[in-house]
Amino acid sequence: MRRFHIAVAALLSLSLAACQKARTFQAVPDDMDLGNKDAKVTVVEYASVGCPICARWQKEVYPAFKSKYIDSGKVHYVFREMLVGDRTEVTVAAAGFLMARCAGKDKYFAVNDAVFASHPGLYDAPKETLLNIAKQVGMTEDQFNKCVQDEKQMNALNARVERNAKEHEVDATPTFEINGKKMEAGYHSLEQIDAAITAASSD
């Protein structure tokens, strides 16, 4: 797992060559979510698109999780942004999240999925990789550059990350919260998540 850091609230240069206590789920206006909002179970994932372990989970577990729980309407899935790892990982993740927000809510998860899918090669040419993803969702290079250098949006991202870390006591990724009850931070198999969802459903 990767430990939490707050990104420097400054313009990104994009020289990018240089991741228990139960509480009631409460939505916030900037949440990004999928699935049935009225589902009995809400799964919140705290993750970073720059986190290698998060990317591994996204590739190996998320497709089956999405099919079984999100697409079926059994779970309300919420993704909350974190910035973790070393300076490069934080910078790349911040750019990825800013780009996903700029692409629009309807493309947010497509952008995140593409960034996760680009691991591990993402760090070989991060700027080029992210720009290519931006173009795939209809952004021009100029729009991409303006997006990832938007100080107001960078500050908003930092505020979301800090809120997630402090209010929800998250300091590592990935962290999963099932109906307000956090699982131990780190990679979890579908079977482990199945068990947590089953337990939450019976409460």
Regions found by a protein language model. Name each.
Residues 38, 99, 189:
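Short, flexible micro-motifs
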Residues 39-42, 73, 95, 137, ...:
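Envelope-exposed proteins and targeting segments
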Residues 2-86, 158-167, 199-203:
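Extracytoplasmic thiol/disulfide redox context detector
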Residues 2-5, 21-22, 48, 62, ...:
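C-terminal cap of thioredoxin/glutaredoxin-like
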Residues 9, 44, 120, 134, ...:
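Short, flexible active-site loop motifs that bind/organize anionic cofactors or intermediates
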Residues 36, 45, 91, 136-138:
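Short hydrophobic/aromatic segments of transmembrane alpha-helices and their interfaces
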Residues 31, 84, 118, 145, ...:
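Conserved short-loop catalytic and cofactor-binding motifs
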Residues 49, 55-135:
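Structural alpha/beta surface segment adjacent to cysteine/selenocysteine redox centers
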